[in-house]
Regions:
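Extended, subdomain-level signal for the structured scaffold at the beginning of enzyme domains
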Residues: 1-94, 189-214
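A short, terminal or domain-edge coil/loop segment
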Residues: 83-90, 112-126, 176-187
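Class I SAM-dependent methyltransferase SAM-binding "motif I" and its flanking Rossmann-like core
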Residues: 98-172
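Short flexible/disordered coil segments
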Residues: 64-68, 93-99, 125-136, 153, ...
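Conserved anion/nucleotide-ligand pocket segment
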Residues: 157-201
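Short glycine-/acidic-enriched loop or helix-start segments at secondary-structure transitions
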Residues: 14-16, 40-41, 97-99, 130-133, ...
Length: 214
């Protein structure tokens, strides 16, 4: 399994992402469904920001919108077959989790990562959804946005590809969510939930048996 999970944006050492994902000639995609509750113009700008940042690293990418695959899991499987790296940007973890479920991407990513068929990369919400559970993140993200947008309740289970909760923006001065993240950590400690904190600039790198913070 290959993962590059940053606290915020590309992190301070994106060369690790390039080493992990670059060079195999396959395309990269940006998944921005954590921004699906944002106004269309804001969402579009957020996609362009990620595409430009990846292009600066030599990783040309295009958006893959999971909403286009709601109820079409097999078509998504076919389209992901040619993808070498998926970059899942931050935003609302509950919105992203819902889109992963409706499209079938949650199980597909599990299968593809187990087969070492792609790199899963991203930051903030894009990393948090890999946790065993999203409980506690309602202190940071608006879980009710799922109901307002889709008329369905939010999902609370994560993809459980990580053995502990991923906690970004921890004690990261200047980030607007760092105070709320402190409350998340306090809850996890009180409830005995295993977690891993990352400061902005850091990333969790998983490359087969190797796991480290970069």
């Amino acid at each position: 399994m290959r993962l590059y999970l940053s606290s915020f944006r590309m992190g301070d050492h994106p060369e690790h992402l390039v080493a992990l994902a670059g060079g195999d000639g396959r395309r990269s995609v940006v998944i921005a469904n954590a921004m699906d509750d944002a106004p269309p113009g804001v969402r579009r700008a957020s996609v362009e920001l990620e595409l430009a940042a990846l292009a600066d690293l030599g990783l040309g990418a295009a958006e893959l919108d999971l909403r286009d695959y709601f109820g079409h899991r097999q078509r998504l499987r076919q389209d992901l077959a040619g993808v070498g790296m998926a970059w899942l940007r931050g935003g609302n973890a509950f919105m992203l989790r819902y889109a992963l479920d409706r499209s079938g991407a949650d199980t597909l990513f599990g299968e593809l990562l187990a087969a070492d068929a792609l790199v899963y990369a991203g930051y903030s919400a894009g990393a948090c959804v890999l946790s065993p559970s999203l409980r506690g993140l309602e202190l940071v993200d608006d879980a009710d946005a799922v109901t307002r947008t889709y008329g369905s309740p939010p999902l609370w289970d994560g993809l459980a590809l990580l053995g502990e909760a991923f906690v970004p923006h921890y004690r990261s001065p200047g980030h607007p969510e760092t105070a709320a993240i402190e409350r998340v950590v306090t809850r996890y400690r009180a409830e005995g939930i295993a977690y891993r904190t990352l400061h902005d600039g850091q990333a969790l790198l998983v490359n087969g048996p190797e796991t480290k913070i970069v």
